[in-house]
Amino acid sequence: MASEKLKAAIIGSGNIGTDLMIKIMRHSEHLEMAAMVGIDAASDGLARAARLGVATTHEGVEGLTRLPVFDDIDFVFDATSAGAHVKNDAFLRALKPGIRLIDLTPAAIGPYCVPVVNLDAHLDSRNVNMVTCGGQATIPMVAAVSRVAKVHYAEIVASISSKSAGPGTRANIDEFTETTSKAIEAVGGAAKGKAIIVLNPAEPPVMMRDTVYVLSDLADRAQVEASIEAMAAAVHAYVPGYRLKQKVQFDEIAADVPLNIPGLGRFSGLKTSVFIEVEGAAHYLPAYAGNLDIMTSAALATAERMAQSLVQA
């Protein structure tokens, strides 16, 4: 007998929302795609949803509540913008207090969630924030070092193809850096975090690449490397295109020639450099859009576990 599936809606019919819809319909064990919500009647995402037999509305979150299927919806994925999510959460919560929102914007009303690091702690949350694409790719690496040694500082540089960044991503650049930096600390375990995003205009488009620099107490390098490799394998389980681009690199910062970290002061210890590449599954945009893929894959992995927990309960 097939397991019960819970109904889900997606707000935001752009690149992220459309990719997520395809993932749910092809791969979800516990969720059923029930509605696609947008604000542009001519958007490709709404057109695709309609062709696939999914209920659609171009009247935003208000339109969603007017759809006959709304009463049966348990999960809503929000792939709009940080500002819009705050309003969407309040509007939906007033009508259905128990509804689960998976926030794919940098709004961060609810706790940050990076599935491989802290999902178990948030299975009962009504609103979880998926940080950012850069956060989903890099925070696991910071956490991997954190479980071996105290991390004083972590800096990530996320480089994504300009073609993969839609208007929503571009409008949220400031929020991207702020939210990712905070989550590096809150989830990754760093005392201080910093995030940088680069939109690469290269043609042909390049795959998502991320660089992670971690400054920690001195530790056994083999243990740190093993922790990083194990964490990368865990992410790969739900993001098949996720991989370490090259071997982990280590540098020892001697006490007599310390680094000066703004806002942190002088540092000596172990510098760990991790280089990641994320190839997209090409469900909607081509394979270069790994940033899209890791965000939607993480969101789906989170909702799947939550739905499984609800069904079993």
Curated annotation (Swiss-Prot):
Active site: 133 (acyl-thioester intermediate)
One MF annotation (Gene Ontology) recorded for this entry: NAD binding
Catalytic activity annotation: acetaldehyde + NAD(+) + CoA = acetyl-CoA + NADH + H(+)
Transmembrane region(s): none
Annotated NAD(+) binding sites: 13-16, 164-172, 291
Keyword set includes Oxidoreductase: yes
Top EC category: oxidoreductase
Source taxon at top rank: Bacteria
Transferase as UniProt keyword: no
Gene3D superfamilies reported for this sequence: Dihydrodipicolinate Reductase, domain 2 (3.30.360.10), NAD(P)-binding Rossmann-like Domain (3.40.50.720)
CDD domains the UniProt entry points to: ALDH_C
Keyword terms, alphabetized: Aromatic hydrocarbons catabolism, NAD, Oxidoreductase
Gene Ontology BP terms: catabolic process
EC number, as in UniProt: 1.2.1.10
NCBIfam families membership: ac_ald_DH_ac, PRK08300.1
Stated family: Belongs to the acetaldehyde dehydrogenase family.
Name recorded for this polypeptide: Acetaldehyde dehydrogenase 3
